[in-house]
């Protein structure tokens, strides 16, 4: 069994990997301020509904499209996907969160593990053909590592579920054990989410989440805040 991809994938999905993800709550801070999320049960509901739906219907399908495009080195398609991902984020904060993490990930992995794929993405960025979106860089990186697609999907989904749990420690009275309990319950439901996402075609990919979009837009104007988004 060839697991040469695994150590590097673990490194770049670890919270220690400095792309700034710790500074974002992705709209959750405003939901906590409004009282929508105030305890572990509320957090679990948020993970099982909003986060799960966004993963299943939008992020995981687009991660698969980007992974397959990077594998074929179809950079025209990568440009199209990058634009579509950005257009799907009506909130300025969410767009900027994806942009900043995508740029930082590309900059860092290009230094740590130089690759023609990363050079091409940097060229597309200079030409302003891509932003690049974080998801695009993550997909291309895992193609370059020879990470199997299911593992890449699971790693992205884990990050999406873990981020609100990490933010919750600063936003509500939950504690480390409560946050880990919520995360464990969410992770137990990941497999069917990933399986379902594999059957979604590009023309049907997308999630309508005004609840989160409105919270993120309100967060932009908040009087005080802990997180960038």
PLM features per residue range, with description:
Residues 5, 9-73:
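Glycine/small-residue-rich interface belts in oligomeric ring/scaffold proteins
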């Amino acid at each position: 069994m060839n697991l040469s991809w695994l150590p590097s994938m673990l490194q770049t999905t670890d919270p220690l990997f400095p792309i700034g993800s710790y500074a974002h709550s992705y709209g959750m801070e405003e939901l906590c301020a409004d009282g929508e999320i105030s305890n572990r049960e509320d957090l679990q509901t948020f993970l099982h509904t909003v986060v799960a739906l966004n993963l299943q219907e939008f992020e995981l399908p687009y991660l698969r499209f980007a992974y397959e495009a990077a594998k074929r080195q179809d950079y025209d398609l990568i440009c199209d996907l990058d634009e579509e991902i950005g257009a799907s984020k009506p909130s300025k904060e969410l767009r900027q969160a994806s942009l900043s993490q995508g740029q930082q990930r590309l900059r860092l992995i290009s230094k740590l593990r130089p690759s023609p794929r990363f050079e091409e993405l940097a060229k597309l960025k200079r030409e302003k053909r891509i932003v690049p979106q974080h998801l695009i860089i993550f997909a291309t990186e895992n193609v370059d590592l020879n990470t199997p697609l299911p593992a890449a999907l699971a790693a992205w989904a884990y990050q999406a579920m873990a981020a609100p749990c990490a933010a919750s420690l600063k936003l509500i009275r939950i504690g480390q054990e409560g946050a880990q309990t919520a995360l464990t319950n969410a992770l137990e439901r990941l497999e069917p989410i990933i399986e379902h996402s594999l059957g979604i075609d590009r023309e049907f990919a997308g999630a309508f989440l005004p609840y989160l979009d409105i919270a993120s837009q309100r967060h932009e104007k908040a009087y005080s805040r802990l997180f960038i988004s």
